[in-house]
Amino acid sequence: SKPIPCEKSPQEQLAIMEAYTQAHRDSAALDKAERELRCLRTIFPALFRSIEDDDLLAGRLDFLPIGFGSVTSIGGVSHYCVFHKLRSFKEQLDSEEEKARVDALYAYWEEHDTKAIYCADVLNESTIGRFIDCSYPLMATARLSGMMLNYKKLMAYGLEGLKTLIRSQKPNTFLNSCVESLTLLQEVIDRQIELVREAKLDAARSRLQDLELMERDLAVIRTQKPATFHQALQLFWIYALVA
């Protein structure tokens, strides 16, 4: 993949990271599934980028130094702060007031970054080191990240079908949050439809066919299970981006 600059201004990025941090702070007493959902609402669909001229599927996403993720290679694991990226981001700001706001974020996440908490709990001087450090027999962060998504079930049921399946079980906080997370994904799809319509305004006639297909299929997968290969690709892609 080729790194590209964030589409949003440094001020917009700072505001999003502050909103995420505030949601994380305010939801400390909640169940972890509810807390995750509240935090996700501050970054989705806000972090999605505009449709580009050669896109055949909707869904481009910016990653900030603070957020939520499932892999260390892009963003971070769970509630994360990539500290060296946050320090680099600070250099993009001009005012001392904005830099002080970044310092406040840095201080908060030193105590709350998932990887930092994990390492503080398990690292020791003799046997357990960080990934990758061959000085130790055991590497603490090996496979800390990653998960397997059930794409077959996603294709078989679609988003509304998954909601129905979840609601058929005895309700609890986790399952309720799962339903709300799927609703958030539908809001992400609504935003993608808006972005496609924006792209259509200046599109050449030869490009309109691609964008119209994209818009139609987004409308389908918002509530229905996919019926075509393109719809299946679009659903799995947008689902994976926010998973």
What does each model-identified segment do?
Residues 1-168:
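Long, non-catalytic protein-protein interaction scaffolds
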Residues 156-243:
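Structured, charged N-terminal subsegments at the starts of enzyme catalytic cores
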